[in-house]
Regions:
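Charged, alpha-helical interface segments at or near domain boundaries
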Residues: 11-26
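Short, small-residue-biased leader/transition segments that mark boundaries at the very start
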Residues: 1-6
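Intrinsically disordered, low-complexity segments enriched in serine, threonine, and glycine
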Residues: 26-181
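Generic structural signal marking isolated hydrophobic packing positions
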Residues: 7-9, 155
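Short acidic/polar capping segments at secondary-structure boundaries
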Residues: 10-13, 77-79
Length: 181
């Protein structure tokens, strides 16, 4: 009598799933600590706790040895248009038609809106979220878009927008996959 083992994926994962799952946050601006302060020298600030700085790209270090699918969550802190996501390492990109998102949501992108894009094998999707409702937003990807995967090693991931880049924050999540023990 023969027994067969059927798996949903041919890849190995770390025994402790928490150690194999990763999330990397990258935002287009990093907010700083703030409070009301009356500066006696208005021309030259005397109390600085932080600076806003552009961080629209990050290097994601992928430690697996097989290409990995990703889930990209894009948070909107306000209006934005023409949002694009690139993996420069693999020369792949996602172009988001924000006019189509506006059509699906009933108005232009605003603070609190979110997109989730999954390149999972057998689980590809684009979802838009507003006010607790979920919308199928696959139609918002243009015909030249690719699904974003990570390759072993360093992956340069960049987020851009035609307008409102300071209102875009992103997190990329992935799981380390291995082809053999």
């Amino acid at each position: 009598q023969r027994q067969m083992c059927i798996r949903d994926s041919p890849f190995f994962r770390l025994r402790d799933p928490a150690k194999g799952k990763n999330s990397v946050r990258f935002t287009t601006s990093t907010p700083s600590f703030e409070f009301e302060f009356q500066d006696p020298n208005a021309d030259s600030p005397t109390l600085i706790f932080g600076e806003m700085s552009s961080t629209g790209e990050t290097i994601v270090v992928y430690e697996g040895d097989a290409d990995a699918s990703t889930i990209v969550d894009i948070q909107f802190l306000g209006p934005a248009a023409g949002v694009k996501l690139y993996n420069t390492t693999t020369q792949t990109r996602i172009n988001i038609d924000t006019n189509e998102i506006a059509r699906l949501l009933g108005s232009t992108i605003r603070a609190g809106d979110r997109l989730s894009i999954s390149s999972g094998v057998g689980d590809k999707y684009v979802r838009a979220y507003r006010d607790g409702k979920v919308y199928n937003a696959l139609s918002a990807l243009d015909k030249d878009s690719d699904w974003i995967f990570l390759t072993p090693g360093d992956n340069l991931i960049t987020v851009r927008a035609d307008t409102g880049i300071d209102n875009v924050s992103a997190i990329i999540s992935f799981e380390n996959l291995y082809e053999s023990i």
